[in-house]
Amino acid sequence: MRKSRSLFTDAKPRRTGALVYPMLLILLLAVIIALNFVNNGRVKLLNEDVTITSLSKDLEKFRILHISDLHGNEYGANQSTISTMLKTARYNAVCITGDVCAPDGSYDAFLKLIDVFAGRVPVYFVAGDEDPAPIAAQTGAPERVKADYVLAAEQHGAIYLDSPQKLTVGKSAVWFCPESMYGLDIASSRTAYQARRAALINQAQNAPDQAAQLQVIDYQLSVLDKIEAAIKEMQDSDVQVALTHHPLTETTIKTLQQWSGNEDSAFLRSVSLVLAGHYCGGQVRVPFVGALKAPASANLAGWFPQDNLIQGLSTIQGVTQYISPGLGVSDAYPIPLRMFNTPSITILTLTSVLKF
């Protein structure tokens, strides 16, 4: 006997899953986005040991605070997130490896970052590819060759690294050097600048940018003199730390190592540590895997690049390089945000102790 069907019973069961699953997915995405937003407001302090077997006792446990790719970001009022985190940290010098300005060229956040350290430890910095040119002819003010943000940073106590700077520790020394000086043929560069200077002087005196160009050339000649003097002063026992924005590739390192300039030239093989940035840790990272993609401008461009070539410590052709995960967001990536990638700064501790 067939059961009668109630007039009030639906012919088909409701498919509640068709609504629940999309809602759960939307909720999950909202939670991830919210957590990522909070995470990007934090700053993580990393610690790395760098082994230099010939390190002197004076430099054992010498610490360098490495910061990169600020991109004009401010973490708390007056960079209070960073200053609070570092309140009990110990370090002997601060190295900033470029991309310090905001996309619009403003640099207030950079100056506030310098103020966290200035007067306590030396602060060295180089410019990045997304910063305004640090040195350029100023037609309206020919006596100036440095960009406004460089001059302002120097007024706040930082040191623009256009030539080697010596930091003496006991009877030992650490030299902080611009990477651009390695492989530089000083004699040839000086000859080229002097020829250019002579050509400008022989031009008509009413050239509007003549004075500005001459000022830049004189500045570059003075930089060559300072590099040359520093190279002559450097001892084999000194530690050389090279600052660069773009990480050095294996090809670049091989080329610089093969450099056979005159005795007054600097050699990359004398460098104990290279500090770099630029990649922002890949910007978007896959948990437990690494960077999702390298920027198109990188030699290792592509999906899931080798992670120690994007961030962290590595040794290439005998050269130790540390690439900072950075703080901000680079225009080199199509997605303008950090994902699963906490903004980070690093304290690198020099040691003679081998670790296995």
Which positions does each model-derived feature cover?
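Active-site neighborhood of phospho(di)ester-bond hydrolases with catalytic His/Asp-centered motifs
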Residues: 66-68, 93-99, 123-129, 161-163, ...
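Conserved beta-sheet core of the metallophosphoesterase superfamily
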Residues: 248-343
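Beta-strand-turn-beta hairpins that frame and shape the catalytic cleft
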Residues: 51-65, 164-178, 192-202, 232-241, ...
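N-terminal Lys/Arg-rich, disordered targeting/topogenic segments
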Residues: 1-17
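N-terminal active-site segment of His-dependent metallophosphoesterases
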Residues: 28-113
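Core catalytic region of metal-dependent phosphoesterases/phosphodiesterases
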Residues: 79-169, 267
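Binuclear metal-dependent hydrolase catalytic cores centered on His/Asp/Glu-rich metal-binding motifs
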Residues: 135, 155-157, 170-243, 250-264, ...
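Acidic, His/Gly-rich catalytic cores of divalent-metal-dependent hydrolytic chemistry
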Residues: 8-10, 24-31, 35-46, 307-311, ...
